[in-house]
Every structure is written in structure tokens, then in C-alpha cells.
UniProtKB/Swiss-Prot annotation:
It is an enzyme of class 6 (ligase). It comes from Paraburkholderia xenovorans (strain LB400). This is 7-cyano-7-deazaguanine synthase. Keywords: ATP-binding, Ligase, Metal-binding, Nucleotide-binding, Queuosine biosynthesis, Zinc. Catalyzes the ATP-dependent conversion of 7-carboxy-7-deazaguanine (CDG) to 7-cyano-7-deazaguanine (preQ(0)). GO terms for molecular function: ATP binding; ligase activity, forming carbon-nitrogen bonds; zinc ion binding. Binds 1 zinc ion per subunit. The gene is queC. The keyword GTP-binding does not apply. It catalyses: 7-carboxy-7-deazaguanine + NH4(+) + ATP = 7-cyano-7-deazaguanine + ADP + phosphate + H2O + H(+). Its cofactor is Zn(2+). Pathway: Purine metabolism; 7-cyano-7-deazaguanine biosynthesis. InterPro entries: QueC, Rossmann-like_a/b/a_fold. Zn(2+) binds at C202, C217, C220, C223. The keyword tRNA-binding does not apply.
Amino acid sequence: MIRKDAKRSALVLFSGGQDSATCLAWALERYETVETLGFDYGQRHRVELECREGFRNAVVRAFPAWADRLGEDHMIDLSVLGAISDTAMTREIEIEATANGLPNTFVPGRNLMFMTIAAAIAYRRGLQVLVGGMCETDFSGYPDCRDDTMKALQVALNLGMDTRFLLETPLMWLDKADTWRLAHELGGAELVELVRVETHTCYLGERAELHAWGFGCGECPACRLRKRGYEAYLAGENVTEPV
């Protein structure tokens, strides 16, 4: 059962990927008005960003009740983040572990910047809730995806803007199988199919072949995690071991 809070409005960090798409559905089921926010920070491909409009349009067609709640979409040019980053998310380099144990897909400061800009937009537009797809269960060790980070950031943003934002991370303690299950709980098989077909997770931007779990190369860490989570969801299992 999803608790509804119809008097509140939310801004969802929406990249066009599976996690943020599920968070968007979660917010649409919960809040009266929901706006979306994406960032172009010089990613190595634009496939995920290009999925954003298609998923939003598909949700409007498939779920009329949500269509009335879905508000404006915002796209922010954050190319400065790509300019100061040297990662596999912003450069054509092999995906591998670095000396500190983190994969080189980690973009330092990314979620901190995303949430800070989201808060500034929400402040201007009178939105009370910020929603992000950060997760500490199925993740690669990114420090800016941790629950402690998000809680500390909520405090800092509220102090710095003298407001009472609520930072919601509905996937924080879910594995990928649970994320597929949440989509089913929110919108049934139709939403699961929209997430499968209309979103993109692959680090390499491969969208030539539609697999059972969605589009992707099938080999990068993001694809393997998505694939394994989908298979576990179909089998009714949990997936908590690292890929």
C-alpha cells in the first residue's frame, strides 16, 4: 500500500533510467503535483536522456490519473560537471575499479550537485519534496548514494535555504528485484512493461537489441544488475549479492 500525501508537491530527479522512472511513478501515485528534473552533464551518451520524454508521454497515455498530476519537465545544462570529471560516465574509457576501490563510473559530487540544484528549483516553484533514486542495497559503493549522505544533505539544504524540504529516496533499501516489484505494485504489468521498454540503464548506451529485461549491451555492470534483478523479480527472489 502506497501512502498518499495529496497536499504535497514533488520534484523528481528523472534521468530516463529504470530507478528514476520507478521513483516518478511512486511520486505520481503519492503527490498532487509532480515535476521532473534532468541533467545534461556531458555523459558519454545521450540515450538515457532521450528516453525521458518517451517515458513521460507513455505514462500520460497509460495512466490518466497520473497524467493530471504530471507537471513541468526541467532540463539543466550541467556540463561543468563533465568538464571537471574524468570517469567512465563522461569519457570513452573502459569501466574498471580505481585505486580507492570505487568503479570509475563514480562521478564525484554528482548527486550532491543534483540535489542542490533540485532544491533551488523546488524553492522557486514552491515544491516541498525532492525525490531521488539513490540506493544503498544494489549499488557500486558510491558514497553519494548512501542514506547517511542524503539525510545530511537534507539538513544542509534546509539550513541553507531556511525551508523544510523532505528528501525522499524510495529505493534506498530495495534491491533491483524489489524495484521491479515496486513498479508492479504501482502500475501493474503495464508499468513494468513501460519501464522495461521505455527506460535505459546501459552505461554504453546500447539500444539496438531489446532483451527480456530491456535494452542494453548485456555486459556492463548496469545491464547485468538490471538483468539479474528482472529475472529474480519474475522468479520471486531477492538479489542482494554484488554483481
